[in-house]
């Protein structure tokens, strides 16, 4: 739902995997189904006649689409090798194979740059199921391995067509780039740390700056899970950008405590073009912050907002709406949000496979429809009747939308909209007109009534502490040593 409205990001991870596959000597094509249609895919399949097709499954809500496309690909190209990878796919590999009913040859868990060329080399070999991170109907290999050097396999951006379609908010058009990978924190609702094993790796300042310099777009989303944890790294990249005279507008995401600790660095990047920042507040009260294991206080969150205002950054924040909220809780969030200048988003608490709360949440799922696992739908029991919950959720989002996108916001956001239009970019302007049709309480409620073809396996009974072997994709180094 959010990708229908607020953003459409280039498939950076897939571009990096494509670069690795191309470096291994293969002819590669990339088709982004955020932009292209299923008919476009069918034409590409018929014209290119690939020996292998890989689907990147980063979002759980796309599982039914990927399964159906894999089955159709098998019918149209019986000899084609079909694999699935990506963030969400890594956590549900066995059930993807089960849903695929023979259409999927393997699921690749973990990072794809190193292992995908090896999979293609071994695709008709009995050794396929022995490769790290590979899961087949015949078995699975050892745990996946991490990419040892982020400077390898820079994105094959030339393979992504219609790049003018990529944007985030007022940054239209917008490319994506990666300076670091991973997150050392352990928030209970997040799967970044469980995927990467709490590792944190950095690209070299020289290569990071060279990559940014190669980007044609005027705007760049820095996709790091937590930007600028290590200030010396951020300063070094900035100095390289200055030396190369690279000037862009940047969007990034970070934590409030990182902003407080490294405020001089963020002020420096403001001079380099940092325009837009996302801060995951997640909650306004200490009890909820502890529940989410944010390891931060409300006071620190509010201090970070003050710092961002002083620097002069446009800031978006997120609040997690728990399914147990009542009308008064929504009202309190609306009241607070109208007193601050920041853009405030609400997402619905969702226990995804791969998050710790998938294992620890005692409330039973009310739906196992993959399409509803998008942080816009309630998949846990709601305190209010479900239709009333959506009414309050959409009412809150509508009020906040008018705050940031209504007439009062024209002085701040009107110029970016005009500038985008003068470039022939219409993504942001179209976003302004689509809110009511996308964020709609009746649509969200009706989504629960759709027939379900593919259901995820239910979680096991809740436990206090998950087994690390089940929780992590890439096992943390300290746990590997203990094994």
Predicted regions span which residues?
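Glycine- and acidic-residue-enriched helix-capping/strand-helix junction motifs
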Residues: 2-14
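Flexible glycine/acidic-rich beta-alpha junction loops that bind and position SAM and/or redox cofactors
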Residues: 4, 92, 185, 232, ...
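Radical SAM [4Fe-4S] cluster-binding motif and immediate context
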Residues: 9, 157-319, 323, 335
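Glycine-rich beta-alpha loop elements in corrinoid/cobalamin-binding modules
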Residues: 13, 17-147, 348-350, 354
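Short acidic active-site motifs
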Residues: 39-41, 92, 261-265, 329
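Radical SAM enzyme core and accessory elements
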Residues: 42-45, 51, 103, 139, ...
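Structural recognition of alpha->loop->beta junctions
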Residues: 95-114, 268-277, 333-347
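Short, electropositive alpha-helical surface patch
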Residues: 237-241, 327-343, 404
């Amino acid at each position: 739902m959010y990708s229908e409205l607020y953003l459409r990001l280039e498939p950076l991870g897939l571009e990096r995997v494509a670069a690795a596959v191309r470096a291994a000597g293969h002819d590669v094509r990339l088709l982004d189904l955020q932009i292209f249609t299923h008919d476009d895919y069918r034409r590409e399949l018929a014209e290119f006649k690939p020996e292998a097709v890989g689907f990147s499954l980063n979002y759980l809500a796309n599982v039914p689409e990927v399964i159906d496309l894999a089955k159709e690909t098998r019918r149209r190209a019986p000899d084609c090798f079909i694999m699935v990878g990506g963030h969400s796919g890594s956590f549900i590999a066995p059930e993807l194979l089960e849903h695929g009913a023979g259409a999927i040859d393997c699921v690749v868990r973990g990072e794809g740059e190193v292992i995908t060329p090896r999979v293609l080399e071994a695709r008709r070999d009995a050794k396929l199921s022995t490769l790290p991170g590979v899961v087949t109907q015949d078995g699975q290999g050892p745990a996946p391995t991490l990419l040892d050097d982020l400077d390898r396999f820079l994105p094959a951006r030339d393979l992504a067509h219609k790049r003018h379609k990529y944007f985030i908010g007022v940054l239209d058009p917008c490319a994506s780039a990666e300076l670091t990978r991973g997150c050392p924190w352990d928030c209970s609702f997040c799967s970044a740390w469980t995927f990467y094993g709490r590792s944190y790796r950095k690209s070299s300042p020289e290569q990071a700056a060279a990559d940014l310099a190669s980007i044609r777009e005027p705007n760049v989303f820095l996709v790091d899970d937590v930007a600028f944890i290590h200030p010396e790294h951020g300063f070094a990249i900035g100095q390289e950008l200055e030396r190369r005279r690279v000037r862009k507008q940047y969007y990034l995401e970070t934590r409030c405590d990182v902003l407080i600790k490294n405020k001089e660095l963020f002020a420096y990047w403001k001079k380099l073009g940092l325009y837009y920042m996302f801060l995951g507040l997640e909650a306004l009260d200490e009890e909820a912050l502890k529940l989410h294991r944010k390891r931060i206080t409300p006071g620190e969150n509010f201090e970070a907002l003050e710092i961002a205002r002083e620097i002069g950054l446009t800031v978006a924040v997120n609040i997690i709406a728990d399914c147990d909220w009542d009308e008064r809780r929504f009202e309190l969030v609306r009241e607070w949000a109208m007193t601050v200048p920041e853009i405030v988003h609400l997402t619905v608490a969702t226990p995804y496979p791969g998050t710790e709360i998938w294992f620890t949440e005692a409330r039973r799922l009310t739906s196992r429809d993959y399409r509803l696992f998008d942080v816009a739908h309630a998949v846990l029991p709601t305190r209010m009747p479900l239709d009333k919950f959506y009414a309050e959720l959409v009412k809150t989002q509508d009020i906040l939308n008018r705050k940031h996108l209504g007439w009062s916001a024209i002085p701040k956001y009107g110029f970016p909209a005009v500038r985008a239009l003068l470039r022939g970019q219409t993504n942001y302007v179209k976003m302004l007109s689509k809110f009511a049709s996308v964020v709609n309480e009746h649509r969200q409620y009706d989504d629960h009534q759709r027939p379900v073809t593919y259901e995820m396996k239910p979680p096991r009974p809740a436990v206090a502490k998950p087994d690390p072997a089940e929780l992590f994709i890439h096992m943390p180094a300290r746990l590997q040593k203990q094994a």
